[in-house]
Structures are given as structure tokens and as C-alpha cells.
Amino acid sequence: MSVATIRAPSSAVTSFVVASRYMPVYLALILLVIVASIWAPAALGSVGLSAIAPYGALLGITALGQMLVIMTGGIDLSVPGTLTMAAVLMVGVSQQSDGRIGVAILTAIGVSALIGLVNGILIGGLKLNALIVTLAVGQVALGAVNRYGRTISVQSPVPTGWSTWVSTRIFGVSPIFWIGAVLTLLLIVAFRYTTVGRRFQAVGANPVASRVVGLRVNLNQIAAYVVAAVLYAIAGLALAGLLRIPGVNSGMPYLLGPIAAVVIGGASLTGGLASPLSTFAAAIFLYGLNHVMRVMGLPTSLQFVVFGLVIIGGMLVSGDRIIKVVERVFRERRRSRRIENETIESSIDGTG
């Protein structure tokens, strides 16, 4: 006589373990709302949320691009150069004419995609170090922006139609937020329901095995940098509309923020696993945290300290670390159940 071994459904366990790596960012968002409602209620007012939505979404769109690169096991430090290039091209190509907005958008996206292609070929094709390559390409882009900036007036604004549209509200929220939400949804659908998306994740998680089964790892890396650069361009164009007169250093604040959002969002820095939704949520959280600290009147020095500690804390409780903790819990539970079942079986056999 035997007793069936009790096991949790493997699919349910796997789903819970994977989902747990993304849980901390949502808990952090809830905690931020609670803290703000107590010590900085003005941050949650209509004016405060109107400030968080567009700039948080800007960081989110940029973080989505960085996420794609990190999923391939790389990193992209050319973000400020690419983003600034797109913003300045909106000014230079449009020449303050609403009729040239479309041409300016296509030009900015095209040039940015070219920057991403250069990154992808050097890293995916020639196997150069991603950190060094993207840093160098970003510097080249910033140099080109400075040179191009001399050909247009320093005080030239973007077309009125563009700045007006970016500053409008759709269902009470900035259109930049809706753009970020749509891009996030598209990536979720791609990863879950398309062959290309599933292969992209598989290649990032295990490039060696992917090569063995015939997947084109190099092409995967190149595509990641190109799509990421297009997302940076979208963020740069939106930033130009918000600033109205973008400068040659407009993209500099977006060097480390997107990386922090990806990390806090639970992505695996070794490649493969990442969630577009948690990455976008992490970006909203980071900008919201900055906004709340400003409303609370914290000194700038203390804001830097808090921001840094939050990033470190996010790395400690999200991603691979929390996965190991959850797996350890399930392992101990399975072990205790196995011992219990063996004990029951032994007692039954003994009485038989």
C-alpha cells in the first residue's frame, strides 16, 4: 500500500517563481503612494500627477529600450547621445514649421536607428565590449549633436503644433504616458504571443544553446540595439516637445535612470528574463520618488542619498536574488513533504 506523493503543479510553481521577481516594484509603488499621502499629499494632487505622468513615461520609454539590450546580456550607454540627437533633429529639420513635423519625426527615428545599427554590428557582429562600444558611440553622437547645433539658432523652439500636442491631455493624462503604455503593451504581446518574441527571450537567456539549435544570436543582438535606439528617439522627440527649446545636453539625465529602472523592475542582468510592465512601473516609481522628495523639501544632497539607497535596495530584493529566495522556500517545502510522505509510507508498510 502506498501514498501518492504530494506535489505542487510545476507550471503553477514556475509561474509564481517568475512572477515573484517582479513583485517588489509594485510593492514599492504602493509604499510610495502611502508615504506621499502622509508627508507630501500635494504630490498626489492633479498638478503633481500631471508632472509625474509625462516625465515618468519618458523614463519608462527609455527604460524599455535599455531592457531589450539588457535582455541580450548587453548594456547601452549611448542613450543620452541618441535621445539628444532626436530632440535636436526635431528643431533643425522642422524649422519651426508644423508642416515639417512628420519629416522631422521620420528623420529623428531614422538617424537613431542608424546609431543603434552601428552599436549592434560592433557588438553583435564584431563581438566588441558593449560597455565600451556604446559609451564611444554615444560620445560620437553627442559630438555630432554639438556640431549640428551650431547650424541652427540656440533659441530655436520646436514647432508650436508639436509642443501643443505633447502638452495636451488625453483622458486627463499626458499623451506621452499613453504612448509609453501602448509600447509596453506591444512588447508584452510580442514576448507572450509571438514566435519572434519568445525566441528573443530564449536567445538572451541561453545564447550558447540557441546557437546549437540554429537561432541567429548575432542578428538578435543587432535587432535589440536598433529597436532600443528607436525607443530612445521616441523619448527624445517627446522631450523636445516638453522642453520646447531642447539643448545639446538635454539627454544627459537619462544615462543611469533607465538602467536603474530595468534593475528595479526585476530584469536579469545576465540576459533573458525581463518584464516590460514592471520596467515601465519602475520608471514611474523612480520619477515619482524624485517628485515626492522635492515636494517634501528634502535637500538635494539627501535626495541623492535616498535615491541611491533605493536603487541598492531594489537590487537586493528584486530580480535574481528574490528568485533564489522563493526557490529555496519551495525546495524546503518539497523536501519536508517528501520526508513526511516517506514517513507515512514506512509506517503503513510496517503495520502491513
Regions found by a protein language model. Give the residues of each.
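Cytosolic-side transmembrane-helix boundaries in multi-pass membrane proteins
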Residues: M1-I30, I34, V212-L219, M293-G352
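Short loop segments and helix-boundary regions at transmembrane helix junctions
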Residues: V13-V18, I70-I75, S94-Q96, A113-Q155, ...
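Hydrophobic alpha-helical transmembrane segments
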Residues: Y22-L27, I52, G60, G81-T82, ...
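Structural signal for alpha-helical transmembrane segments and their membrane-water exit/capping regions
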Residues: A28-G45, T72, V145-S153, I188-T195, ...
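Single transmembrane alpha-helix segments in multi-pass membrane proteins
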Residues: I30-Q96, I121-L128, V262, G266-P276, ...
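Helix-loop-helix "hairpin" substructures at the membrane interface of multi-pass membrane proteins
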Residues: G99-A108, S112-N119, I123, I170-G247
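Transmembrane helix-bundle core of multi-pass membrane transporters
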Residues: A130-Y193, N220-A223, L242-G251, V295, ...
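Transmembrane alpha-helical segments in multi-pass inner-membrane proteins
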Residues: Y232, L242-G308
